[in-house]
């Protein structure tokens, strides 16, 4: 995508409409905006349940991807303190994003959400923080916006082709010894490509979300890179090389090709703080 131009553009009237809607939401026209796309089960439970999907009524196999919005308050408020407006996106969500900071806006629940504004916000945001729920697609795919993926699972399906992207995965805990799996163990235990909750359960793995601090760290890395204030440490290049050397380009179980050119960076602070994970 980074090699092709953006083809979706707004008319002058649409831009005027978008600016007017921003004002209603309480956001200045030239504000810096970060979108927050955090998955829970509400969308499939409520929106899809109302549709005629005869082939599937039970969506719980997706539950391994669920995330707690409370873990995103810290990063939202820190970004707000830095001058960013943070908008929590979503058509249907389980619980509100609770913050007293007026620059942290629970757009999914403020009765001002529209399909048009979803796309308009995607076009003007600085970057997206996403759990890989699909809500990031307009910003990332249509407008080539940078994205920070957190709690991303399955790790072998990271969107490595997206330039200016960062990622960290959930912690994989063994139910046998209650220890966290290393990256190599995630791959060798065949859970790196699990796409159903049952798959993790059958392989004796429980997923634990990234901490608010881990989420904040990788988001700050994005901010610093976008503002040309990022200072890498001498160890970073080695850690990235080690991670991507371990990361398979094909699915271990059947050789299916998953990745081509790697354009993504794994969270630098996460790797610095968890060097054991790469052993």
Regions found by a protein language model. Give the residues of each.
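Leloir-type glycosyltransferase catalytic cores
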Residues: 1-24, 163-279
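Short hydrophobic beta-strand segments
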Residues: 29-46, 52
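Hydrophobic anchor at the start of a short beta-strand
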Residues: 33, 86, 147
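Catalytic donor nucleotide-activated moiety binding site of glycosyltransferases and closely related
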Residues: 36-44, 67-114, 238-240, 244-245
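Short catalytic/ligand-binding loop motif for oxyanion handling, primarily in non-cytosolic enzymes
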Residues: 42-46, 95-98, 137-139, 156-160
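A solvent-exposed, charged loop/short amphipathic helix patch at secondary-structure junctions
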Residues: 43-67
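Surface-exposed alpha-helical segments enriched in charged/polar residues
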Residues: 73-77, 81, 120-123, 220, ...
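A donor-sugar binding/catalytic signature common to diverse glycosyltransferases
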Residues: 117-166
């Amino acid at each position: 995508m980074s090699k092709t131009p953006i083809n979706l553009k707004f008319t002058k009237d649409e831009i005027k409409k978008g600016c007017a809607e921003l004002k209603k939401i309480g956001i200045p026209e030239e504000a810096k905006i970060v979108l927050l796309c955090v998955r829970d089960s509400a969308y499939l439970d409520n929106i899809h349940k109302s549709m005629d999907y005869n082939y599937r009524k039970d969506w719980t196999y997706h539950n391994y991807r669920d995330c707690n919005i409370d873990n995103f308050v810290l990063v939202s408020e820190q970004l707000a303190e830095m001058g960013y407006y943070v908008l929590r996106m979503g058509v249907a969500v389980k619980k509100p994003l609770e913050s007293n900071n007026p620059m942290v806006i629970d757009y999914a629940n403020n009765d001002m959400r529209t399909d048009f504004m979803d796309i308009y916000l995607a076009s003007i945001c600085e970057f997206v923080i996403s759990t890989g729920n699909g809500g990031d697609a307009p910003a990332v795919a249509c407008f080539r916006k940078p994205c920070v993926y957190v709690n991303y699972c399955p790790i072998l399906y990271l969107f490595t082709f997206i330039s200016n992207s960062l990622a960290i995965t959930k912690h994989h805990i063994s139910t046998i010894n209650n220890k966290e799996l290393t990256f190599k163990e995630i791959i060798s235990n065949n859970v790196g490509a699990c796409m159903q909750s049952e798959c993790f359960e059958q392989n004796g793995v429980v997923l634990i979300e990234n901490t608010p601090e881990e989420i904040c760290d990788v988001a700050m890395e994005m901010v610093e890179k976008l503002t040309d204030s990022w200072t890498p440490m001498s160890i970073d290049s080695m850690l990235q090389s080690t991670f991507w050397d371990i990361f398979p380009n094909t699915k271990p179980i059947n050789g299916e090709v998953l990745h081509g050119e790697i354009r993504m960076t794994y969270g630098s602070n996460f790797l610095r703080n968890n060097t054991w994970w790469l052993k």
